[in-house]
Amino acid sequence: MSDRNTSNSLTLKERMLSAGAGSVLTSLILTPMDVVRIRLQQQQMIPDCSCDGAAEVPNAVSSGSKMKTFTNVGGQNLNNAKIFWESACFQELHCKNSSLKFNGTLEAFTKIASVEGITSLWRGISLTLLMAIPANMVYFSGYEYIRDVSPIASTYPTLNPLFCGAIARVFAATSIAPLELVKTKLQSIPRSSKSTKTWMMVKDLLNETRQEMKMVGPSRALFKGLEITLWRDVPFSAIYWSSYELCKERLWLDSTRFASKDANWVHFINSFASGCISGMIAAICTHPFDVGKTRWQISMMNNSDPKGGNRSRNMFKFLETIWRTEGLAALYTGLAARVIKIRPSCAIMISSYEISKKVFGNKLHQ
């Protein structure tokens, strides 16, 4: 039985269970690369520590407290691009910037583990699991459902996966946007020692979120960065699914050597390799939006300008500013960590999904 026929014969519940099969595994294995990627991407926003003589301004996180402002190496004032954790960082970490600056993916991985504790690499894992399971269920099952009922499925078979993948990602990304925002913020917070408790960070983060909701409203605060997230995720999905469908048809193992390309283990290898290749291509193409998303979500609005008037609301101008002030390489910060995460993540997720579908399909026809 062909893959498409198997997919058509499965119920929506079975597709969703298939999609959830690999979510736990990928989250447990690959969350550390998410933490490393976010830490690398926020580095240009971290001021060089100069506590002595630094000016104090009201802190948006807690009423009545003070936070210090700094000037970066180039002399540009950072008031309009503060990281939300600045006050907590410079109060509790005592400006130990040695634990904040990294020269690459491997150094970031080892420094975070040694300074903050190995468990810091899995910070936010509960949120990751809480998001990954429903998001992947919506995403994968939604993609196949839309693909199968699409009016252009027969007339434009090459374009159909592209459009269906993009539509499925819009629903999936929007459904988990508030949780993704909280997870990104939580994973970005550094600490100077292993004694700093995660619950303290969560408490400060929730307090900061409440303050921002009062400033700009619940919807703008909780869905902050959704637009640029969609600019990252929708093209990613379009590229991924079109590449995956192409790779799956072209890369299957020689059926003359093996009994059938429908054999479970051959099917697994084909799906794994296709997912790995497609994920890497999509990650490279969309990475500048990932950098922009991280910076946008961890930045804190100026108290005197709740509408964010001093920051461009256009994400393309936002990315262009990063390019002009820091160079093109800044838009690819953390690419290695993201590719290291996405390649096996896509491979494990799609192969688990395909194999689970085959299991359900086999039971259906027994």
From Swiss-Prot:
The keyword Isomerase does not apply. The keyword Transmembrane helix applies. Disruption phenotype: Loss of mitochondrial manganese superoxide dismutase SOD2 activity due to misincorporation of iron into SOD2 rather than manganese. Normal SOD2 activity when in association with YFH1 deletion. Doesn't impair activity of a cytosolic version of manganese SOD. The iron regulatory transcription factor AFT1 is constitutively active. Accumulates mtDNA mutations. Elevated mitochondrial iron and manganese levels. One of its GO terms (molecular function) is pyridoxal phosphate binding. Solcar repeats lie at residues 14-149, 156-250, 266-359. GO terms for biological process: import into the mitochondrion; intracellular iron ion homeostasis; pyridoxal phosphate transport. It comes from the Eukaryota. SUPFAM superfamilies: Mitochondrial carrier. Keywords: Membrane, Mitochondrion, Mitochondrion inner membrane, Repeat, Transmembrane, Transmembrane helix, Transport. It is a multi-pass membrane protein. Involved in the mitochondrial activation of SOD2 by specifically facilitating insertion of the essential manganese cofactor. Has the ability to activate iron regulon in an iron-dependent manner. Responds to calorie restriction (CR) strength. Present with 538 molecules/cell in log phase SD medium. Belongs to the mitochondrial carrier (TC 2.A.29) family. This is Mitochondrial carrier protein MTM1. It comes from Saccharomyces cerevisiae (strain ATCC 204508 / S288c) (Baker's yeast). The lineage of its organism: Eukaryota, Fungi, Dikarya, Ascomycota, Saccharomycotina.
